[in-house]
Design a protein with these regions (language model features):
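Short, structured surface patches at the beginning of a domain
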Residues: 1-134
Length: 134
């Protein structure tokens, strides 16, 4: 994992975090708390980030994006240009299949919103970002 994002990625950003757990079991909810703490630590290591929101879907499967209320609200807020970067720990938290991931990131790109999948090392505005999603 890269702690501090360099080069053009280092410019000031309005950042949101997206986290999801698929069940409401105690261990999953604890994992969600760990995800949020991890995001906070990451933000502290990137001083040009201003965290404006966190979107969390609890106890919801990732198979259908339209059934994830926080995810859909995040997309609506992207349309309103409330932020310019979504940070999520890994691709599997964002989408369960390649088609959904590509469709969502392409839509977000139209609004000027990038997605950074930290553990996967994928930044969607990179030249190879879309290819690496597949």
């Amino acid at each position: 994992m890269t702690d501090y994002i360099g080069n053009y990625k280092n410019r000031p950003r309005r950042v949101v975090f997206y986290g999801r757990v698929s069940t409401e079991h105690e261990e999953q909810l604890s994992a969600l708390g760990n995800q949020m703490e991890w995001y906070t630590d990451l933000a502290l290591r990137n001083p040009n980030w201003t965290v404006v929101a966190q979107y969390i879907d609890e106890g919801i499967t990732g198979t259908q994006m339209k059934k994830r209320p926080s995810f859909m609200r995040m997309i609506e807020h992207a349309k309103e240009h409330r932020f310019d970067l979504i940070v999520t720990r890994e691709l599997s938290r964002f989408a369960r299949n390649t088609v959904d991931a590509l469709n969502a990131t392409r839509e977000l790109k139209q609004y000027g919103v990038e997605v950074y999948f930290v553990n996967d090392g994928i930044w969607t505005m990179d030249g190879d970002g879309e290819v690496r999603l597949t």
